[in-house]
């Protein structure tokens, strides 16, 4: 659904907007609960904003990295896809150390500190060269993609891998 809009407005605008949403949402998490009449609404609005940004970042980074002129694309893409795991571990580690040093009542400051990551990436994506994603200027259309049987096999594999990832995540945290 969003692919046609991203192609129309460009990957740079899309990824910078996604980073802005993530930074604003995380910063809002520290500020909005005190500004709004209901702290819960402040938290919900913030979570929705940074979730939209984070989801877009996840979807947009793969094609941007894929378009980069690297010699070893497979290794680079594998590294990119491992960042979710490294990010989870890093966030847990940094949060734990932060809470041990500053206490749980300082959680708002942690949200502001975490917002620095997308804030720095706003500059990074605004200034870095982004290669065109398709050679001839026209990609595969959605209808054309739906007609390929391999597409549906990949969809099923992604559903199964997502289900197994969630199962492992739930099992490991239990």
Question: What annotation goes with each model-predicted range?
Answer:
Residues 132-154:
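Juxtamembrane intracellular "pre-TM" segments in multi-pass secondary transporters
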Residues 12-15, 43:
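Primarily marks hydrophobic transmembrane alpha-helices of the MFS/SLC 12-helix fold
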Residues 20-37:
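C-terminal ends and interior cores of transmembrane alpha-helices
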Residues 147-174:
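Extracytoplasmic gate region of multi-pass secondary transporters
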Residues 1-11:
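Helix-to-loop junctions at the C-terminal end of transmembrane segments
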Residues 44-82:
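Cytoplasmic helix-loop-helix junction between adjacent transmembrane helices
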Residues 71-72, 76-130:
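Helix-loop-helix hairpin linking two adjacent transmembrane segments in secondary transporters
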């Amino acid at each position: 659904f969003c692919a046609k809009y991203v192609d129309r407005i460009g990957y740079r605008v899309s990824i910078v907007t996604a980073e802005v949403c993530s930074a604003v949402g995380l910063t809002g998490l520290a500020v909005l609960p005190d500004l709004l009449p209901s702290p819960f609404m402040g938290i919900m609005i913030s979570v929705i904003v940074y979730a939209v940004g984070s989801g877009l970042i996840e979807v947009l980074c793969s094609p941007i990295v894929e378009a980069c002129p690297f010699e070893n694309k497979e290794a680079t893409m594998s590294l990119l896809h491992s960042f979710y795991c490294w990010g989870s571990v890093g966030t847990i580690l940094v949060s734990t150390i932060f809470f041990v040093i500053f206490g749980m009542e300082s959680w708002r400051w942690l949200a502001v500190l975490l917002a620095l990551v997308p804030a720095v990436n706003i500059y990074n994506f605004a200034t870095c060269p982004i290669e065109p994603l398709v050679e001839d200027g026209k990609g595969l259309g959605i209808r054309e993609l739906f007609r390929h049987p391999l597409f549906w096999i990949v969809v099923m594999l992604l559903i199964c891998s997502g289900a197994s990832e969630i199962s492992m995540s739930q099992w490991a945290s239990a």
